Design a protein with these regions (language model features):
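Extracytoplasmic thiol/disulfide redox context detector
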Residues: 1-75, 156-160, 190-195
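Extracytoplasmic/periplasmic, Sec-exported soluble proteins
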Residues: 24, 39-43, 74-82, 91-98, ...
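Loop/turn elements at helix/coil->beta-strand transitions in domains of secreted/extracellular proteins
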Residues: 26-27, 58-61, 96-98, 135-138, ...
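Residue-level detector of short, conserved catalytic/binding motifs and their immediate flanks
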Residues: 35, 84, 172
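Alpha-helix initiation and N-capping motif
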Residues: 48, 99, 123, 136-137, ...
Length: 195
């Protein structure tokens, strides 16, 4: 992911929505995702670098909305919630560049568990991953302790409400001004940005 420099900021609001931006761009892209969802991983593989660059260039504010639709498809029964909590920990304790690095790691084929797999990752293993990625020690400890679990559960509940209001029933979902964007076209982001 392209580095964003010191001007970038990450903020988690009272609804658990994580916003990454430089300044206050007019274009705000809302991305809804679940850490076990294969299409979510494919979306990030296809678009993560371009979205990160658009943030780094100050062209968009990226708002990440965490879901846990697929908790029951994980071996532990709560992997999505714990992975969502880990993203909140990184946002709170590390910073915007680390958030996008962690996002990319969570949705990589190496890390993302398969639906209905016999095993997934424990919180301790996610903490070890943060250490491996050179995250600050307090991030690894918070992830291992599942410190942000309550925040992740609240964020997921708000995600359900937002998607229901928008008439969306699945993730990944990309919305701008509460309207779903067709991300099936290769130029969807450049069209939104205007070039």
């Amino acid at each position: 992911m392209p580095p964003m420099g010191q001007q970038a900021h990450v903020q988690v609001d009272g609804r658990g929505v994580l916003t990454i931006a430089i300044g206050t761009p007019k274009l705000v892209i809302d991305e809804y995702q679940d850490p076990i969802c294969p299409p979510c991983a494919q979306f990030w593989a296809d678009n993560g670098r371009d979205l990160s660059k658009a943030v780094a260039d100050g062209k968009i504010a990226l708002r990440l909305h965490s879901a846990n639709f697929l908790d029951d498809k994980s071996a532990s029964g709560d992997y999505s919630t714990r992975a969502d909590a880990s993203l909140l920990a990184v946002a709170d304790l590390a910073g915007p560049n680390e958030v996008l690095r962690w996002q990319t790691a969570l949705y990589s084929s190496v890390v993302q568990p398969e639906e209905n797999a016999a095993v997934d990752h424990t919180s301790q293993q996610l903490g070890y991953l943060a250490t491996y990625l050179d995250m600050p020690k307090e991030v690894s400890l918070a992830i291992a302790a599942d410190t942000y679990r309550r925040g992740a559960l609240d964020a997921a509940a708000n995600t359900y409400d937002d998607l229901a209001k928008a008439g969306v029933v699945s993730v990944p979902a990309t919305l701008v001004a509460a309207r779903r964007v067709d991300t099936g076209r290769s130029n969807w982001l450049s069209e939104l940005i205007g070039g």
